[in-house]
Every structure is written in structure tokens, then in C-alpha cells.
């Protein structure tokens, strides 16, 4: 795409990663201008700048030809050789930042967009993946109350103790023939009465195959999503339904149509590991390397084209021994880039004694994680509400 076309697309918010990037630091010296910080799509809160009247002042850093005059959003930047810095005040939810270099090579510019989490506060969310066993258990045993099932009782106790909120990401079926249409709707009043802290959401059609949507067409993902969502609404009601924040295995086709289909269904946030495995970024919704690397050490990143914000999962309780739960969370809370939103995850199957990899102290791990963030002043939220659980 030619530079002018790229910048026009950027101005319309259509670019998925960066606005108008050109090469800097070529053999003859710096020949273009580049904004290094903030990152395009970055989410800024009070930890990333200075509160000023009506806004948040953040620092813009980058590189440009040493002899060029540089301005950022029309304000002259400070220069130090090839480097430049400038202060920009964020006053709207989204702000375009444009750096312009005027020099012997002509006029060059680079542009990014950032999101201001204006009403941010320290918060955590707790999601549980791979849910199906508890629904099968309730359906087959016909309990008088949902909370006669030990799994939901355990979550209810954590809510009573800490005010915790949970979203349970649900499969349509299990491998022994149970399917969501078999779950009765007679518990709808109880689901409704507990929807302020307990929600159900789409995860996948089934546990197997692994990575079911990594290469699946958008039609397959959409159909499975709608199938699960319809059943949740039927037996638990609209109040209990939540648009998903975790697709099974956190991998989808990296196509605009996929994210557009999810956004159309109310998806506002997607959580992943954004970690390197065998030399490749994984559990990252197949985002490009630059964004995956950024998300590996930041809370969140906005994809402006779809409107979806990606969130970094900070801990997976079933993979961390009880004695290491707090040690795992401590550095997350110390880093201003990861400390504002704590994204906690675990998986349902490890609670059940019949499961081959049953974890006897799984519930204690949840208690330890929730107790720690609660004692540190974090509030429970649903990630799909507002902006990552905070008011817009």
C-alpha cells in the first residue's frame, strides 16, 4: 500500500497495527520519523502519565533525522541527536498522535492512536475455561439448587468471602453424550438472582479437537458461538449470558472477518497468554509478532479496526502450585504496565476427582489468588462490561 493510502486508512482507524510506518536507521542514517512510545493501540491509565486538568499527560518518544524539525500534534518536540520527546495530553477516549519531521528529505510523519482508560481503577477478573462437567452433574442429578453442586458452591463461597465474580466459559457438549439442550430451564430464577457475580459464556463446541478455531472459517466459529449462546439464554436467561472473553485455545484465523463477527456478537475483550512457545508466539489469537510481544508485558492493547481489546492473562491457577500463587502475582502488581488489571484464569476439569489430572488443592489456589489481590485493593469486575470492567 502506498504511503498516502496507508495514512488515510490510519486516519479512519482501519489499520490493525501501526499507522504509516517507514524504515528508520537505514545505512545512511535516520531517513524517516518513527514513534516508539506509546505503542499503537496502547491503553493508558494514571500509571502511565501525569494527571492534568481534564486529561492525562503522556510522553511521546521516537526517532527522526537529527537535523529535522520535529513536532508532535503541532507542538515542537525536544531533540537529543536522532531521538525526540514530547508531551501530549489525552483528553478523549481515543487520541491520534502525529509526529512530523521537516528536513532536507522533505516532510515525513508517523501516526499512532492510543486509548485512555479514564475511569480506571485497580481491578481483577476471574474466568474459568472448559466448563461442562458441572452442567452435566446438575442435569443428571436434578439438584434442588444449583449450589447443591459442589463446584458452584465453592464459587459461591468465594463470592461470599471476597465479593469475587466469575465468568464460566462453556462447552456445548461433553465426550460422553451430554449436550446443553439436556440442561433444564427450571433454575432460571436462581441463575438470575446470582447474575451479579456469576455469568456463563461461549468457549467452544467441545473440548476436542484442540485448537478448534485456529484455522476454522469464520462461519464455523460463528455457528458454534451462536449455538452455545442460544442455550445459555434458554436455560439461564439473558441476565446470566455474557459475550465471550476467551475462545478455546485462544487461537483464531487472523482475518478481519473473524474479529468483526465476534464484535458483532458483543465481544469487547479477548484474553490470551501471549507467550513464546518453541520460538513462536502462541495463545495469542494469531496476532502479529509486534503486538504479541507488546502484550506479553502489558495489560491490554486495542485493535481499533474491530473495537476488540486484547488482555494479557496474568496467572492460570491450575498450572501454578499453591505455594507459588502469590509469588507469581507479586511482580505483576509491581510493574505499572501490568498492575492495573489482573486477569486470572483456571480450568474447570481440575476440580473434579474423576478427572485424570485432578488437583486436590485447586480451590485453595483460587482462594489464595483472590485473597491476595483483594488485600491489595483490587475490585472484581466482568471484563466485557464498560472498558475492561471500568466505566467508559
Please identify what each model-predicted range represents:
Residues 27-52:
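Short, compositionally biased P/S/T/A/G/V-rich stretches that sit at domain boundaries
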Residues 58-64:
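Aromatic/hydrophobic beta-strand junction motif of beta-rich domains
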Residues 88-94:
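Surface-exposed, short loops/turns at beta-strand junctions within beta-sandwich domains
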Residues 112-193, 241, 344:
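Active-site beta->alpha N-cap acidic-glycine motif
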Residues 165-253, 276-282, 342-344, 348-352:
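Metal-dependent polysaccharide deacetylase catalytic core of the NodB/CE4 family, i.e.
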Residues 176-180, 239-240, 244, 249-346:
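Active-site-adjacent pocket scaffolds in enzyme catalytic domains
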Residues 269-274, 346-392:
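C-terminal domain-boundary segment and adjacent tail
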